[in-house]
Curated annotation (Swiss-Prot):
GO BP annotations listed: biotin biosynthetic process
Keyword DNA repair among record annotations: no
Described function: Catalyzes the transformation of pimelate into pimeloyl-CoA with concomitant hydrolysis of ATP to AMP.
Molecular function terms from GO: 6-carboxyhexanoate-CoA ligase activity; ATP binding; magnesium ion binding
Coiled coil: none
Top enzyme category: ligase
Gene source species: Methanococcus maripaludis (strain C5 / ATCC BAA-1333)
Subunit structure: Homodimer.
Keywords: ATP-binding, Biotin biosynthesis, Ligase, Magnesium, Nucleotide-binding
The protein's annotated pathway: Metabolic intermediate metabolism; pimeloyl-CoA biosynthesis; pimeloyl-CoA from pimelate: step 1/1
Pfam families named in the record: BioW
Assigned protein family: Belongs to the BioW family.
Reaction it catalyzes: heptanedioate + ATP + CoA = 6-carboxyhexanoyl-CoA + AMP + diphosphate
Protein name (database record): 6-carboxyhexanoate--CoA ligase
């Protein structure tokens, strides 16, 4: 197996990124698809594209995908309240476990929304329960690497007309993240026209319509219990995972 990693930018601003795990005979085909994806991105034609291909020598871990649940909402305000409640329900368990003030959870979630609304990060921000950012490089964040979905799962998802390639990408990331010890994830898309975002916890992948406005940037935040950041980085970046 080979890991393919694509990232594209324009004037130093992140435009697109994608990860795939493929057999040798598919490298050329998938590489072409990733470059085409970067060049046709709605956020603009990039002036820089990096495509990295590496042989994977470690065992591929197979993970069952999180259950996909779609939450319908017609306003950004309502959608964000839904996301907030999903996050609070999960975070509260860890606040109580660690003897922390649950009244501080809203502040943590406010900070997370501020991060994703600022956008222009290639990867995700990581927040501990005290609101500390734990990424090695704040402007870059952490990229979840060495991931893919099986062809069967991809085909199953895309048979649903309400789901897209973005869902396929996101379910791979969310499933790996939750299985690496992240409490929950909050995400909105980089694509200006795509307003659906999600919250992921061990209970599922919750697609929430209208989580941001059209034309708005996107971002990703991981909530973690402890600060074993080196171990988390190693898993998220290096552990090969296929989601089925």
């Amino acid at each position: 197996m080979f890991s393919l990693k694509m990232r594209a930018s324009r004037n130093g601003n992140h435009v697109s990124g994608a990860e795939r795990l493929v057999n040798e005979e598919k490298i050329e085909k998938i590489s072409s698809e990733l470059i085409k994806r970067a060049m046709s991105h709605e956020n603009g034609v990039p002036d820089f594209i990096n495509l990295k291909i590496e042989k994977v020598t470690e065992k591929i871990n197979k993970l069952k995908h999180l259950e996909i649940k779609t939450v319908h909402s017609t306003s950004k305000e309502n959608s964000r309240n839904i996301a907030r409640n999903l996050l609070k329900n999960e975070l509260e368990k860890y606040y109580l476990k660690n003897g922390k003030d649950i009244e501080k959870i809203d502040e943590l979630i406010d900070f997370a929304f501020k991060i994703i609304d600022a956008g222009n990060m290639r990867g995700a921000a990581i927040l501990d329960l005290d609101g500390n950012r734990l990424e090695n490089i704040l402007e870059r964040g952490i990229r979840v690497k060495n991931i893919d979905t099986t062809e069967e799962l991809s085909e199953k998802i895309l048979k649903d007309s309400s789901l897209t390639e973005r869902t396929v990408d996101a379910i791979a990331i969310a499933t790996k993240v939750v299985n690496c010890g992240v409490i929950s994830e909050l995400c909105t898309s980089d694509n200006f026209s795509y307003t659906t975002g999600y919250v992921a916890t061990k209970d599922g992948y919750f697609r929430i319509l209208n989580l941001k406005d059209k034309g708005q940037v996107g971002g990703r935040v991981f909530f973690v219990e402890n600060s074993k950041i080196d171990e988390l980085y190693d898993k998220l970046e290096n552990m090969p995972v296929t989601v089925y």
